[in-house]
């Protein structure tokens, strides 16, 4: 039975610009029963905020799909801030590193599955599924990972352990139940997914929680239930009932597992006869050894490595049928929002083929049973069957979503800040580098930044070297730059440590750089993916967050793609200017905190201290997981000021404690992949340490 509060947006701002009309029209179309609705939202118009207000209007559980983990995290963060009293969850692949199992027949090379799982992301995945099965006020922000196989929601719910004060549950019986759903007993190291026993007290850290659960028995009855801090043991709150969901999504009861083992053995016998009949004795031997080992593991402990390859048997599905996915955890009336749909929709359609081609080899050469191919992502048709009403968000909607909506779309091009789309200027290629250098110097003098996009890696490298020779502060962003370094480069650009960023594909959706006033597109007339109309519009959008934003296209002719991009930009710009004039709006520069570019999902650990301060019987943590209180992004130092106090007047001991506190926050941010935030803490700590050394040198305390 799903419970939960109503969706409620908490924001210091009201809808503005095109937002009110867009929200009303989206709501009207969805309530009228339209299955597919497109929101054409220009860069910087507040599509995420529009989504939050739409969810509040419709009061329906919502899945928001984003094209990658970074944008999913950014979206989740924004929605958490606007929906602080609801469950905004984050569901992406939990692998930090993943090498899938594969066999290369040409070289007779078997590559064993190798992966590194991020425990925090795994917890957030469990948090999403447990929230979906227990409440309705849920928004899940997910990557394309949500179309991959997951255990069935019915098994996940059926195998959960419900606890209530006053009920009779023998302690040893509870321990057996916990082991059955893959919790491990560990009285020495208390970690997520484990439990420990101390006399009549059992303590568990559920797979989806940062807090532990304490169950106190009196005889065979449950006397009390508490949430507590797993490290200190301090009680956070007392509850009357709770539900412990399984530690893995692939879980089955003893009867279901026995049936699965029986059908696996039947399939194994059939496949071995087939392989041996074709003289493939080596393949048959491989398959027999591996499968029998896995069966024995499942028989003894209810689990085995790679159990997902047997998911068809465990779920009791027929051959060729689609697996259960995150979509199956939603109620039937859920709303789907696809962000950056021009990128995300093709991703969804392409996942199945890449997966099936790899698994065919594994089956053919005896590494897996044929049923392993049924542990797979959804095909496009299967995905379409599982979704209901869908809202597509994009500045450049793709052909699929436009065809689904009959070519109609809701438009959101007027920004709440009054900012207008940049001017587009076409310049000849002759003397383009000298012209570019002049433009760069003009902007560097007034503390503005420049993005330059080229067509090839060689051209980007040569241009970067030449600009350096000319005394320009420039950096080069390319595909080999890792995530941490990429975020650091963007941060340095915004801080003014250099003035120009050169790259090949700088149209990155979500690249949010308000300081950039010029985007230079070299070889704009060379038709291709990087110079298509859609790509050009996305690239133009990178200059749309600056009052004096301009785009310079260097080309000797105007291609059809250029004309389409320029015409669309001019159309939007004319509408924006007319709106500003009619309403007396003066465009305001976007002031976005530099630490906010790529802030990732806040973890539950962020508010554990605040939760601990709530007395037993109090309201405890906010019901929505992983959320800081509104307007409390964590303590930070800014220009020598901390929480309103001048750090130069702080006592030495207090300053040392502050450094220790910020160091701890830096480590948490780095662990959670909040690299920009971690770098900001690092710089602040360095400044404070200088101040501390100065105090020591002066003999001050």
From Swiss-Prot:
Pfam families: Helicase_C, ResIII, UVR, UvrB, UvrB_inter
Binding site for ATP: 41-48
Residue ranges of the motif Beta-hairpin: 94-117
Signal sequence interval, chain numbering: none
First-listed, main subcellular location of the protein, grouped into a coarse class: cytoplasm
Annotated GO MF terms: ATP binding; ATP hydrolysis activity; DNA binding; excinuclease ABC activity; helicase activity
Compartments, record wording: Cytoplasm
Coiled-coil blocks: none
Keywords attached to this entry: ATP-binding, Cytoplasm, DNA damage, DNA excision, DNA repair, Excision nuclease, Helicase, Hydrolase, Nucleotide-binding, SOS response
PANTHER family xref list: UVRABC SYSTEM PROTEIN B
Domain remarks: The beta-hairpin motif is involved in DNA binding.
Oligomeric and partner information: Forms a heterotetramer with UvrA during the search for lesions. Interacts with UvrC in an incision complex.
Family: Belongs to the UvrB family.
Name of protein: UvrABC system protein B
Organism encoding this protein: Mycobacterium ulcerans (strain Agy99)
């Amino acid at each position: 039975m799903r419970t939960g509060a109503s969706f409620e947006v908490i924001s210091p701002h009201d809808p503005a610009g095109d937002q009110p009309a867009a929200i009303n029209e989206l709501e009207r179309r969805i309530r009228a029963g339209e299955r597919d609705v497109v929101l054409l939202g220009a860069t910087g118009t507040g599509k995420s905020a529009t989504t939050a207000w739409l969810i509040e209007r419709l009061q329906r559980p919502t899945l928001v799909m984003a094209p990658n983990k970074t944008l999913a995290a950014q979206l989740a963060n924004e929605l958490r801030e606007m929906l602080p009293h609801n469950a905004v969850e984050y569901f992406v692949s939990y692998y930090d590193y993943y090498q899938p199992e594969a066999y290369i027949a040409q070289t007779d090379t078997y590559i064993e599955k190798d992966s590194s799982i991020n425990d925090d992301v795994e917890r957030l995945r469990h948090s999403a599924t447990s929230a979906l099965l227990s409440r309705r006020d849920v928004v899940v922000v997910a990557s394309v990972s949500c179309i991959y196989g997951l255990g069935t929601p019915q098994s996940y719910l059926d195998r959960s352990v419900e606890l209530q004060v006053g009920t009779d549950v023998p302690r040893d019986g509870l321990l057996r139940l916990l082991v059955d759903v893959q919790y491990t007993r560990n009285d020495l190291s208390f970690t997520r997914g484990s439990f420990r026993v101390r006399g009549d007290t059992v303590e568990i850290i559920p797979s989806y929680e940062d807090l532990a659960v304490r169950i106190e028995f009196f005889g065979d009855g449950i006397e009390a239930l508490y949430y507590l801090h797993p490290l200190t043991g301090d009680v956070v709150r007392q509850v009357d009932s709770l539900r412990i969901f399984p530690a893995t999504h692939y879980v089955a009861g003893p009867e279901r597992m026995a049936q699965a083992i029986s059908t696996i053995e039947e399939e194994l016998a059939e496949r071995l006869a087939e392989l041996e009949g074709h003289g493939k004795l080596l393949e048959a031997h491989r398959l027999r050894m591996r499968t029998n080992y896995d069966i024995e593991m499942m028989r003894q402990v209810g689990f085995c490595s790679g159990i997902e390859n047997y998911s068809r048997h465990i779920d009791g599905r027929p051959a060729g049928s689609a697996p259960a996915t995150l979509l199956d955890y939603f109620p039937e009336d859920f709303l789907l929002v696809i962000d950056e749909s021009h990128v995300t929709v093709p991703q969804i359609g392409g996942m199945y083929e890449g997966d099936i081609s790899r698994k065919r080899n594994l089956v053919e050469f005896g590494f897996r049973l044929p049923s392993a191919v049924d542990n797979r992502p959804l095909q496009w048709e299967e995905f379409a069957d599982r979704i209901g009403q869908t809202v597509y968000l994009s500045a450049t909607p793709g052909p699929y979503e436009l065809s689904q909506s009959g070519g109609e779309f809701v438009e959101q091009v007027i920004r709440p800040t009054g900012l207008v789309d940049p001017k587009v200027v076409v310049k000849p290629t002759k003397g383009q580098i000298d012209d570019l250098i002049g433009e760069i110097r003009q902007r560097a003098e007034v503390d503005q930044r420049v993005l330059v996009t080229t067509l090839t890696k060689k051209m980007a490298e040569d241009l970067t070297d030449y600009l350096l020779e000319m005394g320009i502060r420039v950096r080069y962003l390319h595909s080999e730059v890792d995530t941490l370094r990429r975020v650091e480069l963007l941060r340095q650009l915004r801080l003014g440590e250099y003035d120009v960023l050169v790259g090949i594909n700088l149209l990155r959706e979500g690249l949010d750089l308000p300081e950039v006033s010029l985007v230079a597109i070299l070889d704009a007339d060379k038709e291709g993916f990087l110079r298509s109309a859609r790509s050009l519009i996305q690239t133009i959008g990178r200059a749309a967050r600056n009052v004096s934003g301009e785009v310079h296209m260097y080309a000797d002719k105007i291609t059809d793609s250029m004309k389409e991009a320029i015409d669309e930009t001019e159309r939007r710009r004319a509408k924006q200017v007319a709106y500003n004039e009619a309403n007396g709006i003066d465009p305001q520069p976007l002031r976005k905190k530099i630490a906010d570019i790529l802030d990732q999902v806040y973890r539950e650990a962020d508010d554990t201290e605040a939760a601990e301060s709530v007395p037993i019987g109090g309201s405890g943590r906010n019901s929505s997981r992983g959320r800081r209180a509104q307007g409390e992004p964590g303590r930070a130092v800014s220009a020598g000021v901390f929480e309103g106090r001048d750090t130069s007047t702080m006592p030495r001991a207090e300053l040392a404690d502050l450094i220790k506190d910020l160091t701890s926050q830096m480590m948490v941010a780095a662990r959670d992949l909040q690299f920009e935030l971690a770098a900001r803490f690092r710089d602040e700590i360095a400044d404070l340490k200088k101040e501390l050394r100065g105090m020591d040198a002066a003999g001050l305390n």
